[in-house]
From Swiss-Prot:
Changing E120A: Loss of imine deaminase activity. It catalyses: 2-iminobutanoate + H2O = 2-oxobutanoate + NH4(+); 2-iminopropanoate + H2O = pyruvate + NH4(+). Changing G33A: Loss of imine deaminase activity. Pfam families: Ribonuc_L-PSP. Changing R105A: Loss of imine deaminase activity. The keyword Cytoplasm applies. This is 2-iminobutanoate/2-iminopropanoate deaminase. It comes from Dermatophagoides farinae (American house dust mite). Catalyzes the hydrolytic deamination of enamine/imine intermediates that form during the course of normal metabolism. May facilitate the release of ammonia from these potentially toxic reactive metabolites, reducing their impact on cellular components. It may act on enamine/imine intermediates formed by several types of pyridoxal-5'-phosphate-dependent dehydratases including L-threonine dehydratase. Preferentially digests Leu and Met in cooperation with L-amino acid oxidase, but digests Phe poorly. Belongs to the RutC family. GO terms for molecular function: 2-iminobutanoate deaminase activity; 2-iminopropanoate deaminase activity; deaminase activity. The keyword Hydrolase applies.
Length: 128
């Protein structure tokens, strides 16, 4: 088994619990969930869900790039949302960060998320 490497960047919010921003094993990187927290203020982005989702994807991108990968290397995205009425807006934001062919994806409705977030995004990256 390949040794694991911990990925950490100051360009994304620091973990709010006992976990790493990402862990790399071999050429696969497993990203922890990112929420719409502004890294400079450590406050949640307020306003439309679109703004919160953009911040969550921006945070995810920072961790992806800290691993040495690109967003086009993302193979799987898991999105957790509190309200499925937000689904179309989150889809629109995702298209700002990914182009076809899109990564595989699951979207799961949940009752609550950390910091009262409305969306949380985790992903798996394979570095070629």
């Amino acid at each position: 088994m390949s040794p694991k490497r911990i990925i950490s960047t100051p360009l994304a919010p620091q973990p709010i619990g006992p976990y790493s921003q990402a862990v790399q094993v071999g050429n696969t990187v497993y990203l922890s969930g990112q929420i719409g927290m502004n890294v400079r203020t450590n406050e949640m982005v307020t306003g439309p869900i679109r703004d919160e989702a953009q911040q969550a994807f921006t945070n995810m991108k920072a961790v992806v790039e800290a691993s040495g990968a690109k967003m086009s290397d993302v193979v799987k995205v898991n999105i957790f949302i509190r309200n499925f009425n937000d689904f179309p807006a989150i889809n629109d934001v995702m298209k700002e960060f990914f182009q076809s062919p899109f990564p595989a994806r699951s979207t799961v409705g949940v009752a609550e998320l950390p910091k009262n977030a409305r969306v949380e995004i985790e992903s798996i990256v394979v570095i070629e």
